[in-house]
Amino acid sequence: MSKSNIEHTNGESRTPLLVIGAGPYGLATAAYARRVGIEPLVVGQPMAFWRDNMPAGMFLRSGADWHLDAAREDTFESYLEERGIDPADVDPIPVRLFIDYATWFQEKAGLEVLPDMVEELSHPNGHFEATLQSGRRITADAVVAAPGITHFTVMPRWVEESLSPGRWSHTCTTVDFEEMRGSRVLIVGGRQSAFEWAALLADMDAEEIHVIYRHDTPEFTASDWSFVDGLMDLTASIPGWFRNLLAAERDAVARRFWAEGRLKLEPWLTQRLDKPSVHRWPHAFVIGCRELPDGGIQVELSNGNQLVVDHVILATGYKPDMTKVPYLAGVLDDLELADGFPVLDEHFQSSLPGLFVTGFPATKDFGPFFGFVRGCPVAATLTVAGVEGALDRTGSLA
């Protein structure tokens, strides 16, 4: 089979490369595969998490130099230039603008995305078989899984034990703030997403917004991500450098990211949060909550205070756990995991030959930068090189 050949017959397809997921990492990898002559079959809803799980009024923390193109041609800056947009006029970058860039990038790359969902992936007879929600079946010689963060939300146990469905939500499912106008809301968490959601609620005239967190209030100052460029270049030239560091050295890299991403809040939030309705509760956590007969939620804080709110929002982040990715259930026995993360080689290949995992789940082996869009071009380059090797071994590039 030619590496650029996708065959379709009677609801079944055969492809050298199946890419599961059409977010930034999936699109970046598929585009680069196509550039080197491997025609990928991409399954997913393009930028679905960004469209459906990020509020329309959200802004990105990145600059205009972060993009998806491993070839460095169809960059975000190129998109702005073609659209006649001055980068200074979109700083910070609205999330909807970056989604439009991703659509532009997909079109430039000539990527056709099958708007379906993979329900099950199996590995019979040395190849992969994917069953889609539509019933369609795909046979592939190699697979790139780009699951994003959808499946990896962190949920405190007390929430489900104490509150009925509908009385609480995670930030990723809280995108329509109109229904919270005039409401009393508790946000659990004290990093960027917590304070940005607080600002969005304040913009929507929520009656009370309480932000509770265990640590000091982060500093409102712009993050400096310039140091990431050197780390990306290092990863491109020496893919295994991060995993080969001593534990203390890896921790030092992680602390640098923590300092920029977690100990700082974007200064453009300051004015939006400077309202009587916004209350900060540092050095505190929830020790109990219960629903009241009048419909309120009584929340007890560790500092002795009690609050009554109408809704609880969890800004509690994400943690990779590949056992939570539904379509991987059929191949989990073949995947080596470390604390939920996939164990990957220097080309993002898992312990199951031919199955690659990119994006957020790769952060344990490649570093925290692969939880950011900035890692897309390097991840695409390394992954596609690995895919080429896998296809060579199976004879699919003959």
Name each model feature, range by range:
Residues 2-47, 90-203, 208-398:
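Flavin (primarily FAD) cofactor-binding/catalytic cores of flavoenzymes
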Residues 51-84, 229-249:
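Flavin (FAD/FMN) cofactor-binding and adjacent substrate-gating region
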